Amino acid sequence: MWQTQQTCDNYPPLFANHRLHTKKDIMSALPGLYYKDVRKPIIIEKGRMWCHPVNTAMWRENINPDQKFVVLVRPIEDVMKSLVSLRIKNNHQGDLYEDLMQPGAEPIFRTAAAIALCKTQPQENFLYIDYRDLVSQPLKVLDLIYDFYGWDKFQHNVKKVKQVFTEDDAHHGLDGMHKIRETISVKKVNVDLPPKVAEFCEELNKMIYDKQIDVKWACNNS
């Protein structure tokens, strides 16, 4: 959607032919086109950057002005260890950490900045879920999400989870990145972070967990 919006904003014929109003028609049609083959009453759109203010504004202006967002927050050191472990299993070539620590880089730096900026918006339509709560009390967290959206609750069996959609991780270069295990639990990752990496993670933790954020920093890295 973001690329489409940028194209519309920089497409001279829309301006020359007085068709700027067409932009909203194009944008509002995209979700229906993307999910046209899905026959479900509820669709949960997943994306690390949806909580960024420019993306929430884009959605509210074109799709649903009262849209609600669930923001999953996880300690950065856990994210780093998980990614590095996957890189090792996938025979990653090069430094395991360096590119993950570059300003504005995906999937860690830029996402952390987006979560930080999320807190600059009115908060009534955001629900923050800590990953540690999700794995330790999954049913309680799921109830919170159902209540947040006002949906009828479903009886989940968190001890026998079935993966019904498989993402092609070959496009990410990390086979197993989106594999869902049968039970919701913490999986121990045997990765020891170097001191400079641990310090980097702690600094980002401050930005996503603290109420007071460095807005300039977040804007520059999102």
Describe these PLM feature segments.
Residues 29, 110-116, 141, 200-204, ...:
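Alpha-helical packing segments of well-folded alpha/beta enzyme cores
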Residues 23-27, 111, 197, 215:
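Short amphipathic alpha-helical segments that mediate assembly, nucleic-acid/protein binding
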Residues 1-30, 164-167:
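PAPS-dependent sulfotransferase catalytic core
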Residues 37-156, 170, 177-179:
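PAPS-dependent sulfotransferase catalytic domain
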Residues 20, 24, 104, 135, ...:
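Generic detection of long, well-ordered alpha-helical segments
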Residues 84-87, 119, 147-222:
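PAPS-dependent sulfotransferases, especially Golgi type II membrane carbohydrate sulfotransferases
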Residues 32-35:
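Short, well-structured alpha-helical segments in soluble
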Residues 9, 15-18, 40, 61-63, ...:
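Residues at alpha-helix termini
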